[in-house]
From Swiss-Prot:
A motif (LPXTG sorting signal) lies at residues 1002-1006. This is Fibronectin-binding protein A. B- repeats lie at residues 541-570, 571-600. Residues 541-600 are annotated as: 2 X approximate tandem repeats. It is a peptidoglycan-anchor. It comes from Staphylococcus aureus (strain Mu3 / ATCC 700698).
Amino acid sequence: MKNNLRYGIRKHKLGAASVFLGTMIVVGMGQDKEAAASEQKTTTVEENGNSATDNKTSETQTTATNVNHIEETQSYNATVTEQPSNATQVTTEEAPKAVQAPQTAQPANVETVKEEEKPQVKETTQPQDNSGNQRQVDLTPKKVTQNQGTETQVEVAQPRTASESKPRVTRSADVAEAKEASDVSEVKGTDVTSKVTVESGSIEAPQGNKVEPHAGQRVVLKYKLKFADGLKRGDYFDFTLSNNVNTYGVSTARKVPEIKNGSVVMATGEILGNGNIRYTFTNEIEHKVEVTANLEINLFIDPKTVQSNGEQKITSKLNGEETEKTIPVVYNPGVSNSYTNVNGSIETFNKESNKFTHIAYIKPMNGNQSNTVSVTGTLTEGSNLAGGQPTVKVYEYLGKKDELPQSVYANTSDTNKFKDVTKEMNGKLSVQDNGSYSLNLDKLDKTYVIHYTGEYLQGSDQVNFRTELYGYPERAYKSYYVYGGYRLTWDNGLVLYSNKADGNGKNGQIIQDNDFEYKEDTAKGTMSGQYDAKQIIETEENQDNTPLDIDYHTAIDGEGGYVDGYIETIEETDSSAIDIDYHTAVDSEVGHVGGYTESSEESNPIDFEESTHENSKHHADVVEYEEDTNPGGGQVTTESNLVEFDEESTKGIVTGAVSDHTTIEDTKEYTTESNLIELVDELPEEHGQAQGPIEEITENNHHISHSGLGTENGHGNYGVIEEIEENSHVDIKSELGYEGGQNSGNQSFEEDTEEDKPKYEQGGNIVDIDFDSVPQIHGQNKGDQSFEEDTEKDKPKYEHGGNIIDIDFDSVPQIHGFNKHNEIIEEDTNKDKPNYQFGGHNSVDFEEDTLPKVSGQNEGQQTIEEDTTPPTPPTPEVPSEPETPMPPTPEVPSEPETPTPPTPEVPSEPETPTPPTPEVPSEPETPTPPTPEVPSEPETPTPPTPEVPAEPGKPVPPAKEEPKKPSKPVEQGKVVTPVIEINEKVKAVAPTKKAQSKKSELPETGGEESTNKGMLFGGLFSILGLALLRRNKKNNKA
């Protein structure tokens, strides 16, 4: 009995336990679905931040803060920065450091993943106002705040290992900047100085056998160099100058110009110090062989090193070879009389800051003293009234008078020779805002040095600083106080050029010619070339078949105008469209009492001269300074006295087997050997009626013919053909009007003799063309017409290139339409000369043998361009259509529950692989868990993405799988179909879950699948428990 009872209790307990366990399993599995969904959502928040961010488009960068509220789970805000619509990168400014999610022990470490042009499945669960471009990604089931935009870019955070404690954020912008930095990083080359061969080198003085630095004169270093093959970007060569010269003169810019091939920089120059100059090749030197360079560099006497007159040995060393020259240096003593000497020089000139420094010497002469002396310094040109006060320092020279540097250089930091007495001049020195100063001395019995630092008016084209002294000589006998005073004036000016050709457009003597020759080693053979061609203002780089050596000289020899003698300073900058060799130095100061002088700022030799009048109370030497070298400009600013202003003293030019071709504005000069051909072939368009006779003039074998056909279809002026032959100099002007219409007026067709036949030159070839007839004109010819013929000797010659080609044409093209080519129709005296009939509606018979038949309308020189790129299909309009065919979506809410049980079959259903498959992962029930698998499935639907809009009916069945949220768009009356156009792929990986678990979570019904098994299992337990209980009751009854 006890045993039975115990057995029964045991059975009872087991049965009760089974029932309880089964019930708990059933209930628990039912709740497990909700818990799993909540957990997945929370994990998504943790991993994906705020799922996806769609910014409502803005043309500037916008920062959107998206907040996810998911039931009772924790949420956080993430700041996401989106680029405009064309951006492909989204960066996370700040990643959360600690985000707690249910059932997650590790903090999420976020990393921005950038995927370009990879599809992502999206579903819109909110009404869309701008349906045309709007695309949204909804990865959260409940309340989600989204910003809508035209360009969707998603950040997906991937969990990292537990060992990484700090969030790691990859900013694509930083990566891009780093990449640019790496691209710009300097390429270190090798020293190829040892591979440079000095074929010739010399140092020359353009002004003769001496150099006057105060007159802007300088010497020129000329090199002809040859380089070994295999030069690469970053390779460099050095050469060293002696310390008694520099390459910049008074300019504060310490640079040397670039060596260019046309406008392409082949090598950049820099000053290393201690007289070392380095040229570094750019990537343009790649694949060049047989490279040679002709360099000319201006060298200015350094006033600090060379302080007195005398001979100086100037040297330059390159690859162990020394080029040298010994030349006398003569400085200008300034202006003086028996009592006082005044001298001065512009020490430095800074074009960028509009500032300059000036040094003035004031010293008594021959032991004589002066009373009541007044010294003034004034900007007579370029005064800046709105500028600040200049800085004026007065120094007393303590050394011997004969030791004062003749170069007008003052090392005021040397207190043994220079004493600052500016404070002692309190009340005697006054400075004005307009840049002037005045110093009043009771007695001039000491030598003073005045250092001036001021600024000139920005944009001023002329700067002139005048130092003027008024004084009265001291008398031995005071009773004889009646005497006259004296005045000494010294001007230091700077003439600024905009580096344009002078106003007259004349060309002066060529002094500088920097060539850079090479051969291109890119074909099977070698290709010689150079960027030069027809270098006119509008064209920087043209190709021409004719080798051209181009040099521009923008100064006019002997040009003057300033009695005091201005010094011209040329500052050659790269702003010129014609990057060739410009020279603006005046080679002779003819017509100047004081003499103009030039200084070059780039690579041009600079001519400086300063007058040394002893008989004048007004002395000035002005330095003219030129900045740019675009043809068509003129002199712009002035600077006086001995200023060697040279910022860039070398002008490198590449001329590979090219030149003898100079083009200025619209005038073309072609020089072939000794033959000069000037060709002007652009005449006004012919409109109106061709009227009047055509003249023919032959003078001393100079054949000038004016001929032309009017516009035969409507109105037309006749063009003019000028053909002049004199000693191989041919000037041609030609153009014919339209043909093929009505022709009125008196017209004539002319033929020349063989001797007077004009020559047409194209390139270097001379082509002789004979026409036996004129074109047949279809239309009406009105008025009296005549045809004139000359002998065979007058037949014109057309020259192409350097070869003379005789071409006999039996006829010219038959013209059926409008032909506006520049054609010259000439006939020879052949026996079979065609017959011409005139009068109204008269026809012209002639034979046509050689030239093709021309039909259609040709107006002038025409260029036909074809665009081979097919037009892009209107793909953007396709996605806008799927939204309209989705009216069946209202049926979605009616069957929201039915799709859930058959979910296991969803992956096997054909609808899933079809274009609608992207909708499966984006279902609102479990959008976040499927996110990790989104990339796997969207890859297949990527090709059919254009088919989604084409077959709007198919997306309807998957829409049925949206049980809850589809109801909202139905209420709004708008239907949204999935769009697979996101440029970034969403990836989310749970830190602790395996890939298999994720696969089970892919469909929304994944959780329900496990729930059904649990319910079955729990039900079995409950049935077993009930059976045991019933059995137990039966046992108890027994």
